[in-house]
Amino acid sequence: AKKVVISCAVTGSIHTPSLSPNFPATPDQIIQQAVDAYKAGAAVLHIHARNQEGKPVGDFETFGYILSNIKKQCPEAVIGITTGGANGMSTEERFSIIEYFKPEMASANAGSMNFSYHKLLDDVKEVRYDWEKEYVTRTYDNVFKNTFKDIEYCIRTMNASGTLPEYEVFDL
């Protein structure tokens, strides 16, 4: 029999709370979904942090709360964290999370790309939070920047932190 490793990204940084009532938007919802995924068989939990309004964030306090609570309940799970952060974060902000938490795994993006989801909320009748519309529409004029210099910095930071890369390739 083949062995399979299941990795679960509980939430990414693209979708917003208004897109689904089932979306794990708050830190506690993210924690619960991660624990549920682990109990269902996920060995790797890929984590993005969000604040109480469901907005993607990269602050250490929110990330620390989420990571520590998942690890308490799932001590055997491999926890990987995003270096994609949230749209609008600087390269330094995105990678500082590795140096601070020294996670087992973290995403290593293999290149830059045009990453637009500006029409995501067009068919949503009621947007729950003020931040959502601007968050998605600004991607129309946005590049998800991962230059060779950024990638090298990311890998060096991971090596120094003992973090394994989870390579993410978006465009082939």
Language-model-detected regions and their locations in the chain:
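Structural preference for beta-strand elements that scaffold enzyme active sites
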Residues: K3-A9, V44-H46, E76-G80, P103-S107, ...
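N-terminal small/glycine-rich loop or linker at the start of catalytic domains
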Residues: A1-N22, V124-W131
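Conserved, mostly hydrophobic/aromatic
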Residues: I30, A37, H48, A106
